[in-house]
Amino acid sequence: MLIIPAIDLKDGHCVRLKQGIMENATVFSENPETVALHWLDNGARQLHLVDLNGAFAGKPKNGEAIRAIVEAVDGRIPIQLGGGIRDLETIEYYLDNGITYVIIGTAAVKVPGFLHDACYAFPGQIMVGLDAKSGKVAVDGWSKVTGHDVIDLAKKFQDYGVEAIIHTDIGRDGMLSGLNIEATVELAQALTIPVIASGGVTNLDDIRKLCEVQSEGITGVITGRAIYQGSLDFKEAQALADQLDAATI
């Protein structure tokens, strides 16, 4: 089980939002590359970047900060990136410039043909972010909830060849209210591709509970506010996950 630190970018800074609302942003650092190196030094094996301005604008907006992070990490661990990625040219640019996985969210829901083309053009490097509220998919930086069922869409996207599904419960994201493990397990059981959990991680107990069900196909968990505010110690979390992994082998 990978514990994946989130670096959310707004106006070039590392922030966290509550429930995806841009006005509810807490700035944690004005130097995102320093944050990336901090997590790398603490044993992170993958990073999760989100261009928040890009997610709302529908096009990349934090290019300078993303470049700085990629240069600082220097290929030592994989980086996944989402937010405002709506065309093949943007995907190609990011993958050519140090990003390992590109996460498609809104565009996957609104223009499924684009996702299909992306998976064909860049096999093994496309993830889909499904942001859910009460089992329905939200789009446009979480500002609109659609009528699409999360599991139905995920199955369709799996057939396209996506590498993994990142499942975020937006009612819990940034709220430190605990993961929606039940919904994540239900999704993972319906799929054969990996599911990465996100939204609401609070403490080691959440990590322990998630590790108990990882055999359902949950390979990682993204955490943000908890590791920045200190309710979850990143090193302890990854050590616990490794320990529980070893116990199940």
UniProtKB/Swiss-Prot annotation:
<dbReference type="GO" id="GO:0000162">
    <property type="term" value="P:L-tryptophan biosynthetic process"/>
</dbReference>
<dbReference type="GO" id="GO:0003949">
    <property type="term" value="F:1-(5-phosphoribosyl)-5-[(5-phosphoribosylamino)methylideneamino]imidazole-4-carboxamide isomerase activity"/>
</dbReference>
<comment type="similarity">
    <text>Belongs to the HisA/HisF family.</text>
</comment>
<dbReference type="InterPro" id="IPR011060">
    <property type="entry name" value="RibuloseP-bd_barrel"/>
</dbReference>
<keyword id="KW-0028">Amino-acid biosynthesis</keyword>
<comment type="pathway">
    <text>Amino-acid biosynthesis; L-histidine biosynthesis; L-histidine from 5-phospho-alpha-D-ribose 1-diphosphate: step 4/9.</text>
</comment>
<dbReference type="InterPro" id="IPR006062">
    <property type="entry name" value="His_biosynth"/>
</dbReference>
<dbReference type="GO" id="GO:0000105">
    <property type="term" value="P:L-histidine biosynthetic process"/>
</dbReference>
<protein>
    <recommendedName>
        <fullName>1-(5-phosphoribosyl)-5-[(5-phosphoribosylamino)methylideneamino] imidazole-4-carboxamide isomerase</fullName>
        <ecNumber>5.3.1.16</ecNumber>
    </recommendedName>
</protein>
<keyword id="KW-0368">Histidine biosynthesis</keyword>
<dbReference type="InterPro" id="IPR023016">
    <property type="entry name" value="Isoase_HisA-like_bact"/>
</dbReference>
<dbReference type="GO" id="GO:0005737">
    <property type="term" value="C:cytoplasm"/>
</dbReference>
<dbReference type="InterPro" id="IPR044524">
    <property type="entry name" value="Isoase_HisA-like"/>
</dbReference>
<dbReference type="InterPro" id="IPR013785">
    <property type="entry name" value="Aldolase_TIM"/>
</dbReference>
<keyword id="KW-0413">Isomerase</keyword>
<feature type="active site" description="Proton acceptor">
    <location>
        <position position="8"/>
    </location>
</feature>
<feature type="active site" description="Proton donor">
    <location>
        <position position="131"/>
    </location>
</feature>
<dbReference type="InterPro" id="IPR006063">
    <property type="entry name" value="HisA_bact_arch"/>
</dbReference>
<keyword id="KW-0963">Cytoplasm</keyword>
<dbReference type="Pfam" id="PF00977">
    <property type="entry name" value="His_biosynth"/>
</dbReference>
